């Protein structure tokens, strides 16, 4: 039986940084395809945020509404929404 996680009590046992990294990896096809100017902007802002010491979870959180709008893969969108619910 899996352990029940209560994110409001603690983020203990939730590796949000790893989940955010996996999400960034999953977004690479969108970024590389560059079919929308947002992706170049997103990549630039990610680099700026990371240089300031902010992690990828913060970057994803800042652009969450736009990401939800642009992601066309239902499975990837579900992963993003799970990340939002669990870690943000």
Swiss-Prot record:
One GO process term, biological-process aspect: nitrogen fixation
Keywords, comma-separated and alphabetical: Nitrogen fixation
Position of the signal peptide: none
Coiled coil: none
Functional summary from the UniProt entry: Is required to sustain N(2)-dependent growth in the presence of low levels of carbon monoxide (CO). Probably acts by protecting the N(2) fixation ability of the nitrogenase complex, which is inactivated in the presence of CO.
NCBIfam families reported for this sequence: N2Fix_CO_CowN (NF033689)
Family, as annotated: Belongs to the CowN family.
Protein name, entry field: N(2)-fixation sustaining protein CowN
Species in which this protein is naturally found: Rhodomicrobium vannielii (strain ATCC 17100 / DSM 162 / LMG 4299 / NCIMB 10020 / ATH 3.1.1)
Gene that produces this protein: cowN
């Amino acid at each position: 039986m899996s352990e029940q996680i209560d994110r409001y009590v603690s983020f203990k046992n939730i590796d949000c940084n790893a989940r955010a990294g996996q999400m960034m990896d999953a977004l690479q096809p969108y970024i590389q395809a560059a079919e929308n100017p947002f992706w170049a902007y997103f990549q630039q802002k990610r680099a700026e945020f990371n240089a300031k010491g902010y992690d990828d979870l913060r970057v994803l959180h800042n652009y969450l509404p736009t990401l939800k709008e642009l992601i066309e893969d239902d499975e990837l969108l579900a992963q993003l929404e799970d990340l939002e619910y669990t870690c943000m």
